Curated annotation (Swiss-Prot):
It comes from Stereocaulon alpinum (Alpine snow lichen). Belongs to the major facilitator superfamily. SUPFAM superfamilies: MFS general substrate transporter. The keyword Cytoplasm does not apply. It is a multi-pass membrane protein. CDD domains: MFS_Tpo1_MDR_like (cd17323). This is MFS-type transporter atr4. It holds the Pfam family MFS_1. It is found in: Cell membrane. Residues 16-27 have a biased composition (Low complexity). InterPro entries: MFS, MFS_dom, MFS_trans_sf.
Amino acid sequence: MEDPKSLSAPLTAFNADTTTADETPAAQKKYEDDNGQKAGSESSENTKNSDHGDATEVNTPKSADLEANALRNSSVSRSNQEQEKSEEAIDPNIVDWDGPNDPSNPLNWPTWKIKTHIFLVSSITFISPLGSSILATGIPQILAEFRSTNAELGSLVVSVYLLGFAAGPLVIAPLSELYGRMPLYHICNILFAILTVGCALGPTLNSEIGLRFLQGCAGSAPLAIGGGTISDLIPQERRGKYMGIYALGPTLGPIFGPVAGGFLTGAKGWRWLMWLLLMIEGSVTLVNFVVMRETYGVVIMARKTRALQKQTGNMSLRSRYDQGLTTRRLWRNTLIRPAKMLVYSPIIFLLSLFMAMVYGYLYLLFTTFPVVFGEYYHFSIGITGLVYLGLGIGNIIGLVIFGVFSDKILLAKAASGELKPEYRLLPMVWTSFTVPIGLFIYGWSARYAVHWIVPIIGTVFFGIGLLVTLVCTLTYIVDAFTEYAASATAANAVMRSVVGATLPLAGPSMYQALGIGWGNSLLAFIALAGCPIPWVFYVYGERIRKSSKATY
């Protein structure tokens, strides 16, 4: 039987009251500082490998110097190294990484391995939200097959999936911080596949609704812990572009669902939508089992400690992350952390609220597309599905904006000071106004039935703001709460999913009362009122973070 203290090793460091919310683990900072100094030594070294072996990002002395200066000037890095050395000198029983270049540290993995993991996580993060909207075009067939005329039940088949997105992360994210990312990915992926089969064979409308909720719970795993996985693999100053790729999933997935569903529903029927989802998800799940390995450093170190205890017989050995909490207290602290962060952190609550509003607008717009383009512009069901691509084009433009500027802004501003997560919010400050602009264009061009390309242009503007809002918020949360990244992103996913599930239910009544023009104008005015939120946290976020750091 394992030592109870060793069972509590994976996450005990995350429960210390003295740990600041924006500190990163000492080993990671030591690793970053070491590589930053190497990057600034000679330009010839810049063309070989960065800290992850990615030569494209350090192929100029200017880029390398910025990164090196930023890392050398990090006071957190210096203090963590001193603390690490002090602990090692005092207690020889502490188990740590074998130096800054330890190959078992995910930060030191080969570039191909890191990028493969990020690609697989991003893929499953695309597939899961795809399942949220893929049934939207099949709702009329579902109601007809089950002999129901209740339109609200039809909408519930779609929205209850998002309620599963809200419930799942509250359990999945904390468990990933106890037992690692991989067990949660694998278990949830298998459950998702089984529940997808159930949805494809559902005998009644009520069973379909219940299975869709459970399907959403299982499918929430990549939304809950994907950001944490990227935090495990990529240091802060290089994290932006990878978070941008990851964030495409929650936005492009719901957009491509109706595109695929529009044609497949007419050709094969609504049940084939679930079989298609199963084939896509099952393929990625099989690859995940073969390729992916644990990325969470705390769990890796706990496993190393247990192996050394068994090998040496020295049960006094303990992980550098272990502060001796009992398993019961560890469970209690970890499981309630996402809820506490959502309630007690103004940063997570307000930014998640703003992002949830924009994300809810996405699903609300979905309810208007069949009416606007089917009745106003007389598009067929299949062609109506294609209009969702306007949102996708906006997402791609938003990704380019974020990918080009985010990491460059962080390095440029941090060259003479500390790496501050607030620098991630600057692209969001620039583009937040594209959300109300897009809503105004879409609403009033549809109201007066001008050429069909104009409302689609409006959705492009909205898509830009949606993507930048999502990726900036997620990247900022991961950078600011690195040690609790999974719990922080889970708290964000909960609010985003609740609003995404409930807001569309109010759409038909609102548009019936106000019309498509003034209805979208109301949404635009609300979005306009929220535009200062990113600026507030860009300016005052650091102060707010430090004032609330010990709450959870």
